[in-house]
Regions:
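Non-catalytic beta/alpha edge segments that cap or flank active sites
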Residues: 1-165
Length: 165
């Protein structure tokens, strides 16, 4: 079991209309993880960064998942907000995500800037705002990497060592 916070980045959705967030909430609970916080924020870098900085300081939080703001338009700035607080990038996540997306949406997959990083010993996964994108990311990557029993390795078993100096 891991403790997860979910941040939806959007200019148009509310908790009631956030389909991608609802999908992730369901998948988090089905996997027996704990959703300890959920927020919606506008596509504004300072507001996104403020919430992320607050969350990475929480001792009872392991993972932050964001949905939305990973495309190419002018308002899509989630990766930029995350980059400002990043300790280490996890490039394989975005690469694998785009490979999985390619199987579903073809070359349109290259328009996603989904990414993953470490910040203050916490994983941050930035997913697209589409329901298909969050489903691909969870079912194809996160479901396995957030399972302590997944072999040969997984993100969970690294928790104790993420803050090593």
């Amino acid at each position: 079991q891991v403790n997860i916070a979910l941040l939806t980045v959007t200019d148009t959705r509310t908790i009631n209309t956030d389909k991608s967030g609802a999908i992730l909430v369901k998948k988090i609970k089905e996997s027996n993880h704990n959703l300890i916080d959920r927020k919606i924020v506008k596509d504004e870098k300072d507001k996104i960064k403020k919430i992320l900085l607050e969350w990475i300081k929480k001792d009872n939080l392991d993972i932050i998942i964001t949905t939305g703001g990973t495309g190419l338009t002018g308002r899509d700035i989630t990766p930029e907000a995350i980059k400002e607080i990043t300790d280490k990038e996890i490039p394989g996540f975005g690469e694998l995500f785009r490979e999985l997306s390619y199987k579903t949406i073809g070359t349109s997959a290259m328009q996603s800037r989904a990414c993953a990083v470490l910040a203050n010993g916490k994983y941050i996964f930035a997913l697209p705002g589409s329901s298909g994108g969050v489903t691909d990311a969870w079912d194809g990557i996160l479901k396995y990497q957030l399972d302590i029993n997944h072999k040969p390795c997984n993100f969970v078993e690294l928790f104790p060592r993420l803050k090593e100096k």
